[in-house]
Amino acid sequence: LRFMVKNYMDETKKGFMQNIGDLSFKKIDESNFEYSIKILENCLNTGGIAHGGFIATIADTGMGNAAHIAAGNKRCVTINLDIKFISAGKLNEKLVGKVKVLKKTKSLVFISSEIFGAEKIVATASGTWKIL
């Protein structure tokens, strides 16, 4: 599994994802996963905190990777993503996302995530992925 996750993560670091830094991902058990990333300067908004689009991107990618694994390594696409921003992420802070696969059907995966910074929750997210 570690090899499969690494290869898939290497693939997700192409294109747009090259711009946000090194997102790591690991499987905890069958329904729990974790992702992490350091907030880089190019991921800040004009107020000097992590841009909401950056937070949404890491949530979508972390939960999407979990959907891919939950779906038996089939491709999945996001059909719904809900983000709630709770506190600010700061420059060089490490963010850790805790992912839970809530339910999987033949064609859909339902997932939630909490994103933590240093001793605080930064955002929560939930979404639905279509299995292709």
Kindly give the residue locations of the regions a language model identified:
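Terminal targeting signals and extreme-terminal segments of soluble enzymes
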Residues: 1-132
